[in-house]
Amino acid sequence: MDTQSFKTFNAKPDEVERDWYVVDATNQVVGRLASQIARVLRGKHKPTFTPHVDTGDYVIVVNADKARFTGKKEKQKEYHEYSGYPGGDHSHSPEEMRADKPTYIIREAVEGMLPTGPLGRDTFKKLKVYAGPDHPHEAQQPEPLDNA
């Protein structure tokens, strides 16, 4: 019997090969798009996935300002921030956030779906979000992401 086929594969950080993917967020639902992006960033779409190693790929999101919410979330959802000072608690609707920081909505949704800690922070750095249709990563030859 071949015992090699029963061994669990553990990826090593220097052996990981990373691809680049591009996603068009136009008319995509924010939460569903974010879960697909988080899956690719984490590396769970690969057979070489290892939980304690960053095996994920790079993801470029274009047209992030055109992503949408379902239901009444566009008006009722709130993003909270706190400056640390008394009276420094502020709430913003997605409409306000989209006008001020168009990439914030996608970045916040994806970050919430990644692990907290050093591995999650390193994983999040592989996400590149742009409000318009152009991005500066043409040299990496990104492929379109199938599921998103």
Curated annotation (Swiss-Prot):
What processes does the entry annotate via GO biological process terms? negative regulation of translation; translation
* Molecular function GO terms recorded: mRNA binding; structural constituent of ribosome
What is one Pfam family matched by this protein?
Ribosomal_L13
Coiled-coil parts of chain: none
Spell out the InterPro entries in the cross-references.
Answer: Ribosomal_uL13 (IPR005822), Ribosomal_uL13_bac-type (IPR005823), Ribosomal_uL13_sf (IPR036899)
Query: Which regions span the lipid bilayer?
Result: none
* Assigned keywords, A-Z: Ribonucleoprotein, Ribosomal protein
Q: Where is the composition biased (Basic and acidic residues)?
A: 71-81, 89-99
User: Which domain of life does the UniProt lineage start with?
Assistant: Bacteria
Give me the ranges of the annotated region Disordered.
Answer: 71-99, 125-148
Task: State if RNA-binding is listed as a keyword.
Answer: no
Q: Which SUPFAM superfamilies match?
A: Ribosomal protein L13 (SSF52161)
Q: Which family does it belong to?
A: Belongs to the universal ribosomal protein uL13 family.
Assembly, per entry: Part of the 50S ribosomal subunit.
The name under which this protein is listed is Large ribosomal subunit protein uL13
